[in-house]
Amino acid sequence: MRKNGRGELDLRPILLEPRVSKHAEGSCLVRFGDTHVLCTASVDEKVPPHVYGTGAGWVTAEYGMLPRSTHERMQREAARGKQTGRTLEIQRLVGRALRAAVDLRAIGPRTVTLDCDVIQADGGTRTAAITGAYVALVQAVRGIQKRRQLAQDPVKRSVAAVSVGIVAGQVHLDLDYDEDSTAEVDMNVVATGDGALVEVQGTAEGKPFPRAELDRMLDAALAGLSRLKELQEAALRTP
């Protein structure tokens, strides 16, 4: 039995609280247990140079951790003058994941930026960020639709993410920090609501793992992602 009485294939307590920002076109405060991430969506009526002139739009993301989101205070990256490789990797992952949810041409020549700010970290910040950012993205797109600026709905599918790993020889879903730090295998899985894979990041710590364990982890992750899809849908129904 895991913390809080969780079974090996149980998610942490999940909360997706939409519309928490007064100013952003879309927002969601997402909680995966003790990992809390504020996700906001902002719409800008212009596109980056590599998209300009194509008629398509763009979805991108930025990610950051508040100084005291961890056990000891971290220096702000702005104070250091540069982002870490980890930060750049995660925000690119979030952007790729969210672009899988939409038809960029249907968005039109505008950019939606998802800002994911970690308030408190206890493992799985990138997976929580993706799951909450999707809710914020849909709200922002619905706002554009209400202004009658879109001919069709650009959102084609939902996207969510979850971690999974091998801990003490057993598959565990949605790892917290302590589990992640001792896992023999650590994996992040991003998938659409219909179970199509967007991205799989997996690493063995110490020794390789067989294909059978990969399949077991993917099965566990996809089951958890099905539950996350339900929670996203419920959050988006909230008035």
From Swiss-Prot:
Function as written in the Swiss-Prot or TrEMBL entry: Phosphorolytic 3'-5' exoribonuclease that plays an important role in tRNA 3'-end maturation. Removes nucleotide residues following the 3'-CCA terminus of tRNAs; can also add nucleotides to the ends of RNA molecules by using nucleoside diphosphates as substrates, but this may not be physiologically important. Probably plays a role in initiation of 16S rRNA degradation (leading to ribosome degradation) during starvation.
Binding site for phosphate: R86, G124, T125, R126
Biological classification of the source: Bacteria, Pseudomonadati, Myxococcota, Myxococcia, Myxococcales
Family the entry assigns: Belongs to the RNase PH family.
Entry EC number(s): 2.7.7.56
SUPFAM superfamilies assigned to the protein according to its UniProt record, in alphabetical order: Ribonuclease PH domain 2-like, Ribosomal protein S5 domain 2-like
Coiled coil (residue ranges): none
Subunit structure: Homohexameric ring arranged as a trimer of dimers.
NCBIfam families: RNasePH
A Gene Ontology BP annotation from the UniProt entry: tRNA processing
The keyword RNA-binding belongs to this UniProt entry's keyword annotation: yes
Alphabetized HAMAP family for the sequence: RNase_PH
The keyword Amino-acid biosynthesis is assigned to this record: no
GO molecular function, one term: tRNA nucleotidyltransferase activity
Annotated catalysed reactions: tRNA(n+1) + phosphate = tRNA(n) + a ribonucleoside 5'-diphosphate
InterPro entries: ExoRNase_PH_dom1 (IPR001247), ExoRNase_PH_dom2 (IPR015847), ExoRNase_PH_dom2_sf (IPR036345), PNPase/RNase_PH_dom_sf (IPR027408), Ribosomal_Su5_D2-typ_SF (IPR020568), RNase_PH (IPR050080), RNase_PH_bac-type (IPR002381), RNase_PH_CS (IPR018336)
Protein name: Ribonuclease PH
Record key words, sorted: Nucleotidyltransferase, RNA-binding, rRNA processing, Transferase, tRNA processing, tRNA-binding
Organism: Anaeromyxobacter sp. (strain K)
